[in-house]
Amino acid sequence: MAAASTVVVGAFFLPRPDAPATAVPTPTPAVLAPSETTHVLAGLRAPVEVRRDRWGVPHIYARSQHDLFFAQGYVAAQDRLFQMEMWRRQGEGRLAEVLGPAAVDRDRAARLFAYRGDMAREWAAYGPDTRTIVQAFVAGVNARIAAVGSDLPPEFGLLGFRPEPWTETVPLSRATGLSGTGNGTSEVLRAQLVTLLGAERTQAILPADPARALDPAPGLDLAGLTSASLGGFGSTFADVAYNRLEGSNNWVVSGRKTATGKPILANDPHRVITNPAVRYLTHLVAPGWNVIGAGEPAAPGVAIGHNDRIAFGLTVVGMDQQDVYVESLGACPAGAPGTLGCYRYRGAWRPIVTRVDTIRVKGAAPREVTLAFTVHGPIVSIDTARQRAVAIRSVHREPGTASYLASLALDRARTWPQFQAAMTRWLMPSENMIYADVDGNIGWVAGGIMPRRRWSGMLPVPGDGSHEWDGFVPGMQLPRAYNPAAGYIATANHNILPAGYRTPISYEWASRYRIVRVREVLDAPGTFTVADFERLQHDDRSKLAEALVPQVVAAAGRAGLGGREEVKLLAAWDFRMSRDQQAPTLFAALAPAIYRRAITRELQDHPEASRLVANRAEYGWLEKWLANESLSRAMRDTALVGALTDATADVTRRLGNDRAKWRWGDVHVAVFNHPLSSRYDLPAVSRGGDGNTVYATGGANYRQGSGASFREIIDLADWDRSMVTNVPGQSADPRSPHYKDLLELWGNDRYFPLVFSRARVEQETEQVLWLRPR
């Protein structure tokens, strides 16, 4: 029997058995014949035309802004109603109502981190008309819920519930963006290492970028802090790992580097690979609006794409937008309220603020949960033995930090100044937003709400008032570039701080290997086309392998092992993580094995510290360790050859001795299991690349866990030549022909045109839906 796995859809998790891996799936042809349908709806003010193209992308033509977003909500709910309902329940902390007791902890965390601030400031932060847009969008969703009747997507029947009407606050959820706000798990990890190794040695193992010494707060005892100290936050909203699985690539080149003489912009944001797709493509046309691209189906607007003047695409910056506070607890003064006691803040005892919520649970009695807060934010754990609590301060408490709502301002920007102004409203998650316009300009802005702090933010701090944020960095002071001399801009979650930039916004970044490869290609002579960037988005050359494999082969040769089959396999390899080769499979086990050998040797006097970091694969540190001249060659060779032995044994144990069965594409797969029923599972897809290639197909146990489910390449010489991909389909309804029709394209690294002009839209139209007012 296959081992149980966790399947992710949107943001809710359910146990499911593993699906068998197969080759690239057979193409699924579109089956909808051109047709015309009319839906009569209350709430519309004039007719709206929705043209779905043969890839399932809706092109919405409305006469007013209200009707445009009403229609967007209606159409999104046609395609993604169950996914949207589950996202809504995740944000409101109501999953247990339909999933049962397993979701109670997640619901508690969602309620703990809900926005509870001033609603007037909240709406104003996004822009003057955001509230009316959201109201129209929500009205459209509710119109679909009312219209669908009993013909709901099958998941509702499987779980036995109906979707509820939405309210205007549903798109204000912080749940999606909180995972990208900071470094809570690495703060606690550093605290553990400082306790074991001291600050200086911890800094050597987990170096800051830019360089900065660790700064433990005087008098704060870091002992006893563990991953459990983060409570539900650690597993629900905190960063997935120090080197996050969810990265992204984007680049934009000026016309002097393209065959057309106009810019080309490419973007592939990386998220967890799921069924249904995370992103939803749509085209919005009305007076003042003409924008196409991808967003999250539960929010109005487009977050990645282009209008008729500019194009834009994002990657995660990784700003440090949160801090872990250690609060000192004690008895409250006589007469002071505080059912959980008090905490020490600025020389006085303050009562812990509490709120009791009731979580309804399917198949079980309701659960009462107590939510506790200090001045810094939600309390995620209490250590009664040490009389302290851990609280999280995060920017989610600030107005305007709902994910992607700020894109409504971006969608209407037409110039570089307007683009920059729109990005000052983009607060959470922080993003590298690249830009191109039809006049030939290119640019980049780091957008996000960045706390000002007098300490590094790399360790937990005391909650006594000595470590408080001093406001936020003004948006126009964040890093940016415009028409650089290089003729291109590229980001890949790496350190993007310009030389001399005085406000470090993070000390933790993704590894450099993806951006090194992108720059290597973009710096080459010649000009580029859309097809060139299709290839670059799927580039599988491993710069990490280039750095490590020659050293392994040389060490094996010095040890007299050059004739071994695994050594010859690596020696002949071209460093491409190609599906049709065996060497990538060995390398996938080899690279982490080298790191484990090296870190175990480095921390041989502290096995507990070694255990904490053994699976982190800090390859930047590893390269420096291997280049350290103070280490003997014999010591380094022992680590390299030992790691090769470990990796060979690991792959052999998994796949057997027959090297023909080590083909990377046979074992490295993306899985599209349905979260509720194997009846709706899709075939596993063979993949090339890995997490350190531009292809970005990283994950554990050879499986692609995250990566680019959506890609765009925007041609500013001709919008209709822009290309896009999304997986597995535009619809989340297993009954729809657009449930899986994009899987074959994506699985074979192919795209479809993102048609924009009215003529091309009409040419590619598969179905026309008229929405008419009642």
Q: Can you name each region flagged by the protein language model?
A:
Residues 245, 284-310, 314-472:
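Glycine- and hydrophobic-rich flexible loops that cap the catalytic core of alpha/beta enzyme folds
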Residues 589-670:
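Charged, long alpha-helical assembly modules
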Residues 68-72, 109, 117-132, 391-393, ...:
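Second-shell loop/turn segments in exported
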